[in-house]
Amino acid sequence: IMENITLAPMKVKGISKKEAETKALELLARVGIPEQAYKYPSGLSGGQQQRVAIARALAMDPKIMLFDEPTSALDPEMIKEVLDVMVDLAKEDVTMIVVTHEMGFAKEVADRVILFDEGMLIEENTPDIFFDNPEHERTKLFLEQIL
C-alpha cells in the first residue's frame, strides 16, 4: 500500500521517499486505515481498497477529486465506510465531482445535483430543490424509481 501511494508523488512531483511516506501515513490515517500501510492490496477489503485509492489521489494534492461510482463494486457493508470518508472530504472543503446513485449521500454533501439521461443534462439544482421540488418531469420519474 505504501508504495502504491508514494510512487506518483516521488516520480511526478520529485519529493523524497521520506516525505512521501510521511504524507502517505497521514493520508491513510485521514481515510481511517493507517494500520494497512504495509499490506498488499489483495489483503484488503473492497472498502479498504477504495479508501487506499482515495489516499493515493489525495497524495498528489489535486484541486478537484473525481469519483465515478465509488461504491458500485462494494458489498453493502463497505459502502458506508467509503461514503464516510467522502463526507469528511466534503466537510474539509475538498472539491469533488461524484457520479453516484447514492442519493442520500448526494443530498447530504452536494452543493449542486445534476441529472443526466442519455448524455443530456436534464436538471441541475441545489439538493433541496432537486430532491424536494424537481423542475423536470424526468427528474421526478428518476427519483420515484430510485428513492
Protein language model features and the residues they cover:
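Conserved ABC ATPase signature
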Residues: 40-44, 48
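Catalytic Walker B motif of ABC-type/P-loop ATPase nucleotide-binding domains
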Residues: 65-68
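H-loop/switch region of ABC-family ATPase nucleotide-binding domains
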Residues: 100-101
